[in-house]
């Protein structure tokens, strides 16, 4: 029997506000433990929350960008549970009347087809503190308690781990582009839980689901869902009874591990938050927020294809982050060579950033300098290979490419006469390569070209070298 997965994602995004959701404490990441706290976020007796208006604005903004309907009347609710990281023993969240409903994200599948993944709801809530486990015991840091979150709950429309990854990538790019969250997964400002079950292909009855936590990267998300899918299929095939449960992804052993049986909504005893009034959102406020939404990543990608003529794949990669998209667009305009700008950013520059674990905003050079490098190559002043060496230097020092070329004497040699002398000398000293070429071994020419480039320390124009080597070899 063939099975398919039924997957839904719950994504928590920390909002980029300066202060917490119900008090004036800073939301800055880090700091000494328990220094970004006050009686309100610690839940001390007599303290009363006051809703941060910017949190509501960001909730509306996210909803509009994700094609949601905005609930003009919504309220906050208490979610009751006892855990050391929750100082009040309840979390202020939204239950029956969230700020947003009924949205969607459109992803593109491997075959080029587009698929809509429904968004059931978006609700505002406060984050919990953080538990720090040591050999001596468990410590609690409440700096994160009260940091504003939105939780984005998808419908169970996802059918493969790959689709789940595409959904999360698209969601991340949208939230970061509208600047409601920095979406730094490594710092926990974007966290994802997955719900998965399996059912026979063609069936409409969902199986028993598991919730998976601790998926803090795209790679972890895909691996965890794949593992859990295989575990469910194996159990169902053997006739075993699956139970609804919460599991965590163990990255070190590439398995999911049981945490607890899955709670149901009534376990949390939701009821309205009496210390906060019902929230009324006017049409005028919604329209004000709508005007602040910039060009979204998929819109920008479509424009890049039409305006710059780059491939669709390039445009999608370049718009995953707005910093990369901006860097590309400025470079393309200044260099007048969009494809070269795309190639450098997606190739060597991305490789160097990955090696150093930095982002576009951390680069020491700017789009104008990259455009200058592209122009030097296009003008024949330096070769593409020399350009890569110049880029390495730019990456380390931030110097202008022209200055690097002049300081290191990297100007390309375009003198055919001088290059011809080197070519003749190389051919004369490598008769076996000429013999191989005559016997049909085309690679022999590549070997000779390599020797010429080595002799000229990479400064000879590769096009001229290829032409002269071919001409001279055919004369022999």
From Swiss-Prot:
Pfam family, one: GatB_N
EC number: 6.3.5.-
Molecular function GO labels: asparaginyl-tRNA synthase (glutamine-hydrolyzing) activity; ATP binding; glutaminyl-tRNA synthase (glutamine-hydrolyzing) activity
Sorted UniProt keywords: ATP-binding, Ligase, Nucleotide-binding, Protein biosynthesis
UniProt catalytic activity: L-glutamyl-tRNA(Gln) + L-glutamine + ATP + H2O = L-glutaminyl-tRNA(Gln) + L-glutamate + ADP + phosphate + H(+); L-aspartyl-tRNA(Asn) + L-glutamine + ATP + H2O = L-asparaginyl-tRNA(Asn) + L-glutamate + ADP + phosphate + 2 H(+)
Entries under Gene3D superfamilies matching the protein: 1.10.10.410, GatB domain, N-terminal subdomain
Biological process annotations from GO: glutaminyl-tRNAGln biosynthesis via transamidation; translation
Protein's job: Allows the formation of correctly charged Asn-tRNA(Asn) or Gln-tRNA(Gln) through the transamidation of misacylated Asp-tRNA(Asn) or Glu-tRNA(Gln) in organisms which lack either or both of asparaginyl-tRNA or glutaminyl-tRNA synthetases. The reaction takes place in the presence of glutamine and ATP through an activated phospho-Asp-tRNA(Asn) or phospho-Glu-tRNA(Gln).
Record text on subunit structure and interactions: Heterotrimer of A, B and C subunits.
Family stated for the protein in its record: Belongs to the GatB/GatE family. GatB subfamily.
Name under which the protein is recorded: Aspartyl/glutamyl-tRNA(Asn/Gln) amidotransferase subunit B
Species annotation: Clostridium botulinum (strain Hall / ATCC 3502 / NCTC 13319 / Type A)
């Amino acid at each position: 029997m063939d099975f398919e997965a039924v997957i839904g994602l719950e994504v928590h995004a920390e909002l980029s506000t300066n202060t917490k959701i119900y008090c004036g404490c800073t939301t800055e990441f880090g700091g000494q433990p328990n220094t970004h706290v006050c009686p309100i976020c610690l839940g001390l007796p007599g303290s009363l929350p006051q809703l941060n208006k910017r949190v509501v604005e960001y909730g509306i903004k996210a909803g509009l960008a994700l094609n949601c309907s905005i609930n003009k009347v919504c309220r906050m609710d208490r979610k009751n549970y006892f855990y050391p990281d929750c100082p009040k023993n309840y979390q202020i969240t939204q239950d029956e009347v969230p700020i947003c409903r009924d949205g969607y994200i459109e992803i593109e599948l491997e075959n080029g087809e587009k698929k809509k993944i429904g968004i059931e709801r978006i609700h505002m809530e406060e984050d919990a503190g953080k538990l720090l486990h040591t050999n001596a015991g468990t410590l609690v840091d409440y700096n994160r308690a009260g940091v504003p979150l939105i939780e984005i709950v998808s419908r169970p429309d996802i059918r493969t781990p790959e689709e789940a990854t595409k959904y999360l990538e698209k969601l991340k790019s949208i939230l970061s582009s509208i600047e409601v969250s920095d979406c730094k997964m490594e710092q926990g400002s974007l966290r994802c839980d997955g719900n998965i079950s399996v059912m026979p292909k063609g069936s409409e009855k969902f199986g028993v689901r598991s919730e998976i936590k601790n998926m803090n990267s795209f790679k972890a998300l895909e691996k965890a869902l794949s593992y859990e899918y295989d575990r469910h299929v194996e159990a169902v095939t053997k006739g075993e009874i699956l139970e609804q449960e919460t599991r965590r992804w163990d990255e070190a052993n590439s398995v999911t591990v049981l945490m607890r049986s899955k709670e149901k909504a009534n376990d949390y005893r939701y009821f309205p938050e009496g210390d906060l009034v019902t929230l009324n959102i006017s049409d005028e406020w919604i329209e004000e927020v709508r005007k602040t939404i910039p060009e979204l990543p998929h819109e920008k990608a479509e424009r890049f294809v039409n305006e710059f003529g780059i491939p669709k794949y390039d445009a999608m990669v370049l718009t995953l982050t707005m910093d990369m998209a901006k860097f590309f667009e400025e470079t393309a305009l200044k260099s007048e060579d969009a494809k070269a700008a795309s190639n450098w950013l997606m190739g060597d520059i991305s490789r160097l950033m990955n090696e150093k674990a930095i982002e576009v905003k951390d680069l020491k050079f700017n789009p104008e300098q990259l455009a200058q490098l592209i122009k030097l190559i296009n003008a024949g002043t330096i070769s593409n290979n020399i350009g890569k060496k110049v880029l390495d230097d730019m990456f380390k020092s931030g110097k202008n490419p022209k200055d690097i070329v002049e300081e290191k004497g990297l100007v390309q040699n375009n003198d055919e006469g001088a290059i011809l002398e080197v070519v003749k000398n190389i051919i004369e000293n490598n008769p076996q390569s000429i013999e191989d070429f005559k016997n049909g071994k085309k690679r022999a020419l590549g070997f000779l070209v390599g020797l010429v480039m080595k002799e000229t320390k990479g400064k000879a124009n590769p096009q001229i070298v290829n032409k002269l080597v071919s001409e001279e070899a055919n004369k022999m």
